[in-house]
Amino acid sequence: VVHRLPLRTVRDYVLTTKAGSQFTTSERENYVYWSKRLANATQDPLPVETLRILRMQALMNYPSKGHYMRYLADQQTEKVLLFTCNQQQAEEQAIHTYHSKNKHSQANLDLFNAGDIQRLACVAQLSEGISIPNLRVGIIWHAFGNERKAAQRIGRLLRLNPDQTATVHLLAYQDTVDEQWVTQALESFDPAKISYVDATGYDLLVAP
């Protein structure tokens, strides 16, 4: 299931510069800023590839997906595995996390496997040797610019519980390059099994 979220237009997104100063913008304004720099890349001091990476990082860090991921996870009646982009996002999404800097990762995975906890947030893709019994729901924050890796992550999540059907929820921002990445990541999957949800209005249900 692909969930299409609008970028927020409210100017409540606070960014901190390398010099330490802060300024307030909106998710939409910030995305437009990076897109305009890319469109005029021939006059920009930064290389095109650097600008692409900076725009991708901006998309990965907008808070709207974090709010929506929590909202979506709260709707699940079964245990859910959350794939985030970095350690901070994982820690914000769940009490129990699985990532390289968490010394309790394996213990948390054991609790999740046993059904003692219902939510586990991870950063990196789980290794091929890991299987999770009774896992039917996964939520992926971002498809990344590498569509092959994104497709592998989706396929891996679907195979974590090989004996049963699983549902993968993939979050994407409307009217951004995010949608292109998702489309390319899903090219190898059966279109009949892919559905789309416009997540407009969800922010009325989610605390900022």
Q: Model regions: which residues?
A:
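A short beta-strand element within the Helicase C-terminal
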Residues: 119-123, 127-145, 149-152, 165-171
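Conserved nucleotide-binding/hydrolysis micro-motifs of P-loop NTPases
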Residues: 9-11, 88, 126-127, 143-146, ...
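Long, largely alpha-helical accessory region at the distal end of helicase-like NTP-driven motors
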Residues: 194-208
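Hydrophobic/aromatic beta-strand patches that form the interior of the parallel beta-sheet core
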Residues: 1-5, 13, 96, 139, ...
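Conserved segment of the helicase C-terminal RecA-like domain
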Residues: 156-187
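Amphipathic alpha-helical transducer elements in NTP-driven molecular machines
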Residues: 28, 66, 147-151, 179
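Conserved helicase ATPase core of P-loop NTP-dependent helicases/translocases
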Residues: 79-84, 88-130, 149-150
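Interdomain helical connector at the RecA1-RecA2 junction of SF1/SF2 helicase-like NTPases
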Residues: 1-76
